[in-house]
Regions:
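Zinc-dependent metalloendopeptidases
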Residues: 1-134
Length: 134
């Protein structure tokens, strides 16, 4: 997984120093329960971003490869398969138009109202899609 998440604005609520650290923890959680497959992490990757580039890009963006975000969409996973259904790529894009942090426990409210989006919780969910779940 090519982590290209950039820096956080200081220490996150869970004590993590970066989005990459949180994403690596989420991937490690998946790895701890799998025996026939493992996620491999490339932190701060410089791989080109793009659907169809055979790299599993993980990044924040204001669009989904140029398309606007649907209302209230936190993140998307875009999977590409070959004609036999074999997965070739799974990109995870987080909506950077929203407020993010990383924390444990119940959902929290953001200072501007609404829910403070928990990056770790959403990353765990999206990485499940990379595996083909849901």
């Amino acid at each position: 997984m090519h982590l290209q998440l950039g820096a956080s604005n200081g220490t996150l609520l869970d004590g993590s120093e970066s989005w990459g650290e949180v994403a690596e923890g989420a991937l490690a959680s998946w790895n701890s329960g799998m025996t026939n497959m493992r996620f491999t992490v490339i932190r701060d990757s410089t791989s080109a971003l793009g659907y169809g580039n055979s790299a599993n890009n993980v990044f924040f963006s204001s669009t989904v490869y140029g398309e606007g975000w649907a209302s209230r969409t936190l993140a998307v996973t875009l999977s590409r398969t070959n004609s036999n259904g074999v997965r070739l790529e799974g990109d995870v894009i987080f909506n950077n138009n929203l407020s993010w942090n990383s924390y444990r426990g119940p959902l929290r409210s953001s200072t501007g109202g609404g829910t403070l989006n928990d990056f770790r919780r959403v990353a765990l969910h999206e990485f499940g899609h990379v595996l083909g779940l849901g």
